[in-house]
Amino acid sequence: KKPLGKLQLLFSKAVRILGGDFRWQTLPCEFHVRIQGMNFVIFEEVPSGATYLHLSENADRDKLVSDPAFKKEFIKNMTERFRPALWNRDIGDGHVYQCPDQSIIGLSFAEIAKHRNIHVAEVFVDLLVEYGNQLIWKLVIGNERDDAINDLYADRTGSNLMSFSDAGAHIQNMANYNFPLQMLARLKNMRKNGLETISDEHAIHRLSGELADWHGIDTGYIKKGARADINVINPENLHHSLDSIVEADFDGIENFTRLVNRNDGIVNSVLINGKVAVRDDQCVETLGKSMGYGSFLRAS
């Protein structure tokens, strides 16, 4: 896995030299996803996966994956190394999270393939045929290397923004809503392991004022007369369990859950426009129900 961070920063710099104002959106934590069967957008990057996802009925999908021709095409797609893609298509990195077959929970697809002595992509299709959406697995798509992500943290050329999550569009696949806290926790751990990196002050600016400046929004700074949008956190409790994924009820939809992260013991309080919105990890009752917690932020 070759890091693309430096190449991305170079591309952004080249665009600016040519008169553009381009920034990469950077997720500053590991890109964790949880997938039911084959129901995730990364499979649209390969023809066999796109064919599967474009079928709306489960019966049609089951029929497709049971076809030997599909398995052959899927294996071919998973072994192609020169197709442009976000995902490296190493499906062996995936680990089984839930499955009717309790014996494979916690194992990677690579480990299962080794045990069965067949190609890892073939193992995946076999499990998909047998269990369908009851096969739930997890995967780290990117940002797993501290040295690579550190290049993106430390960039002072204005080539990237610490601003990408996309969890709100994939509520049953990912839960990176607390990526600012995850970034601070990762920096703490990187320093503990002897890796030279940016200061907490610089990181907080990258997560607040820098974003506001680029978007032309009058916020992101603590100063006299400014909106009092403030998070108070306990840095002693920053830890790696911030990226742990749990299921929570989705308000407004019965019997439907979404994936979230927990920040227990970290967020002391949150002020929005000077009003307390969160106290000791808990939202106050008036949040989302009464006026005054915010206003439309117009870009300049």
Provide a role label for each language-model segment.
Residues A14-I17, V129, R186-N193, G209, ...:
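Short, well-ordered loop/turn and helix-capping segments at boundaries between secondary-structure elements
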Residues K1-T197:
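Active-site neighborhoods of metal-dependent hydrolases
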Residues M183-L184, A203-R206:
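Structured C-terminal cores of nucleic-acid metabolism proteins
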Residues L152-N160, Y177, V232-K289:
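C-terminal cap of metal-dependent C-N hydrolases
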Residues G220, N268-S269, V276, F296-S300:
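Ligand-binding pocket scaffold of soluble enzyme catalytic domains
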Residues I136-N143, I198-H202, A212-E247:
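Acidic, glycine-enriched loop/beta-strand segments at the rims
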Residues E285-S300:
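Short, surface-exposed, low-complexity cationic segments
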Residues Q25, N117, D166, A203, ...:
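Divalent metal-coordination and catalytic microenvironments
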